[in-house]
Amino acid sequence: MSLFKAYARVLTYLKKEKNTSLLICAANVMLAIITIAEPILFGRVIDSIAEKSAIILTLTIWVCFGISHIIAYVLVARSADRLTHRHRLAVLTESFERIIAMPLSWHQQRGTSNALHILLRAIDSMSAIWLDFMRQHLSTLVALFILIPIAFNMNWRLSIVLVVLAIIYVLIARLVMRKTKDGQAAVECYHHNLFQHVSDSISNVSIVQSYNRIREETSALHNYTNDLLKAQNPVLNWWALASGLNRTASTISIVCVLLLGAFFVAKGQLRVGEVVAFVGFAQLMISRLDQMSNFINLTVSSQAKLQEFFSMEDSTFHINEPENLPCLQNVKGTVQFHHVTYKFPNSSQGVFDISFKVKTGQTVAIVGPTGAGKTTLINLLQRVYEPTFGHISIDGINIRSINRESLRKSLATVFQDAGLFNRSIHDNILIGRATATNEELYEAAKIAAAHDFILKKTDRYNTMVGERGSQLSGGEKQRLAIARAVLKNAPILILDEATSALDVETEARVKDALDCISHNRTTFIIAHRLSTVRHADLVLFLENGHLIEKGNFQELIDKGGRFYKLLKAGGLIIDQPTIKGEDKNVIPLREAIAS
């Protein structure tokens, strides 16, 4: 993307504030005209003094122009600042909404922290460009276009000096842009590496401290900063050189204007006031050219990060589902996989040709070794991923033909990682259903065996759970996640190893609650416990992404296939009768696999 295209696209983000932006720009154009008038009036004041003629009127007009310029500039600058900050937050919010709505595959490919880094850096750059556009860019262009003809009208010979100066500025800018293009792209790459390392180290701070990696991680950060500086310094050197060359050219231009002006005054071809006015023109043009140079510097330095942001934005529009898709309503819970295949990008892993049907209210246990595709299967049902081949239907409706929001309203999921926000316990449970009453929320917590431990906390339901639930134990986090799913009260329940972090006693209580809420509700369970599998209506045994066996527990035992071998090898956790000796779920392994 060229520099001009990047700049133009940045300005398109102002279209929602088009009227206000145009009004500010129009005011800036008027300011540019006033600015050009000032040196002319000042020159006439000098001529009036030199000729000892009436000066009051000219001086008054000049002073009024100056005061008006100051007041107008303050008002325009304030309006531009307010609009920029307001719109910066608006674009940030809109982009954030699109990013978090992206499928998990999008985040896995790009990296969530990387997407955040791109977003924040690009928003900062765009807001700086917006502000400069409304304050300076347009008025600078207008001033230059008006200034040159007026200068030629005053004295074409002195004007040639200004034209040469403008050409020198343009040539210097083109040279520096060409020399720094690759370097600036490398700088942006090193910025990403640095941010990624910092984010990675902090998010794994427990591992860093446990394995005494503080010195090594800090040393690695020093290496990243050194690489960044090695790439950044040549770019900075070129822009410093450009600044020096511009200053040299502008100084020489002023000297030339003064010398030529003195020569023409001596010959009687110019008045002193005209020379003074022309010097003012030259200084005005130099300031405008400096502004243009700074603008080019800003845009060039932002070009790489803006291109990444635009690429990310385009991908969100490309992946987003079509508008006006119908909603999934009155869900009964019949789920069917029709020859579903999904393969992870750049990997041989995935699920392949999966077909099965679950009737309304049935419980499905998904079993298999690590990496078999159990969680992938669940993610496909939630449209975290989209099948490469085949399709999934709920109540006979292809889930790709309905909008994701309505689909996910019909699903309540408890993940292996509880996924808590750094908010209060109350707010974390309320995520299940934002319109729920406190009584409904408390009841959900009781069902999930969470109410008692919550009441023992100092602030009870107002207790902050910390980042990702760091202030809670594993079991407490899991019970809050279950309470959240209970509160949602969706027709399809998904339990991704939901009780894996619970002790035996708590699990027994939670299992009773889950049995209660899964009654007459289609339930998918990624299972590692024998009792769960034994009471499932349908058991799916996955291996290497393929559905090897399916049927109820006894059918798979009688078959004597891979599921049977998994049981014999101790591949499922056998419940220990530490709570209720008479619990029907607690059976010896030999009884479970008895032929």
Curated annotation (Swiss-Prot):
Main EC class the enzyme belongs to: translocase
Principal location listed in the UniProt entry: membrane
Localization (cell): Cell inner membrane
SUPFAM superfamilies for the chain: ABC transporter transmembrane region, P-loop containing nucleoside triphosphate hydrolases
Alphabetical keyword list: ATP-binding, Cell inner membrane, Cell membrane, Membrane, Nucleotide-binding, Sugar transport, Translocase, Transmembrane, Transmembrane helix, Transport
SMART domains listed in its UniProt record: AAA
Catalysed reactions, semicolon-separated: [(1->2)-beta-D-glucosyl](n)(in) + ATP + H2O = [(1->2)-beta-D-glucosyl](n)(out) + ADP + phosphate + H(+)
GO CC annotation terms, alphabetical: plasma membrane
Source species, domain of life: Bacteria
Record's bilayer topology term: Multi-pass membrane protein
Domain ABC transmembrane type-1: residue ranges: 21-301
Disulphide-bridged cysteine pairs: none
Pfam families cross-referenced by the UniProt entry: ABC_membrane, ABC_tran
Residue ranges constituting the ABC transporter domain according to the UniProt record: 335-569
Domain characteristics, as noted in the entry: In NdvA the ATP-binding domain (NBD) and the transmembrane domain (TMD) are fused.
Subunit structure: Homodimer.
UniProt name for this protein: Beta-(1-->2)glucan export ATP-binding/permease protein NdvA
Species of origin: Bartonella quintana (strain Toulouse)
Gene: ndvA
